[in-house]
Amino acid sequence: HPIRIPFTVPSPSGPVPRFVFSFLIATKESLVLIDAGVHGSEQRIFGEVRDLGRKPEEIGFLVLTHSHPDHIGGAMAIQEATGCSIAAHPAERKWIEDTQCQERERPVPGFRDLVGGPVRVSRLIGDGDSITLGAGRALQVIHTPGHSSGSISLLMRPEMILFSGDAIPVPGDLPIYDDPDASIESLERLMNIEHITYLFSSWAEPKGGEEVYFTMDDGHAWVKEVSRAVSLITVAHPGIGLDHLTRLVVKEIGLPAEAANPMVIRTIKAHTRKS
């Protein structure tokens, strides 16, 4: 059950509207929540739970695909209200349990408004692990680094529904990832999974059928397009500074000037390390 959560990020030109998806999986005994949205998202999530005829207290397990604010922001309030266990990849644990550290190391505009506070990760999960849902169903953990070092995707079997977190960039949207090579490798790994029926991404509306693989192809092409633009501009402007490079790349790939924010600067820096 997808839950679309709108929020805004401050910018010099005013608030920028964004959204993120969380997902509920209902089992007979309890509810599993994938990602917690931003601070305050618990109200929307709990409302969706009640609309399903269930109670928020039935959320027994929260799986975090990674540690960024729009995925962990509501986790503290959700855990306080439900007592749920929280699972994440070991590489994401530090920033989930120490949000002040995350703010220092990865400053995001409006961070303190987006994140309710830290939470303790009670279960560490990695590539190949399985989260049992009951009735023969399970979530297979797939390590998909790139967006962040510990990003995970989840494949629900036997339905073959893929929850990809932020592993699949959206063409025309802000390119946000820490390692372009790892992002490409993760995308290719997901693209090689056969018979995916539905794709539930945090950044885009749910997709089914052939659209699943078209979406992955498009994300793959977007990372390649950013890489092309970085290479083109660094060759044309040897010794160019990072901020100036980012502004030129943003223009080259067709994004507005305000897209050259700290998160995108971080992405472009990663591409220069690749070069």
Predicted features, each with a name:
Residues 81, 182-240:
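Divalent-metal (often Zn2+) His-rich catalytic cores of metallo-beta-lactamase-fold enzymes
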Residues 1-52, 56, 153-166:
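Conserved beta-strand hairpin/beta-sheet module of binuclear metal-dependent hydrolase folds
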Residues 24-25, 128-156, 161:
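Core dinuclear metal-dependent hydrolase active-site scaffold
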Residues 100, 173-178, 214:
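Short, solvent-exposed loop/turn segments at secondary-structure boundaries
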Residues 39-41, 67-72, 93-96, 149-151, ...:
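Active-site environment of divalent metal-dependent phosphoester hydrolases
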Residues 232-275:
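C-terminal regulatory/interaction regions
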Residues 34-36, 59-67, 86-90, 143-146, ...:
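Active-site neighborhood of phospho(di)ester-bond hydrolases with catalytic His/Asp-centered motifs
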Residues 40-43, 50-134:
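Active-site HxH/HxHxD metal-binding segment of metal-dependent hydrolases
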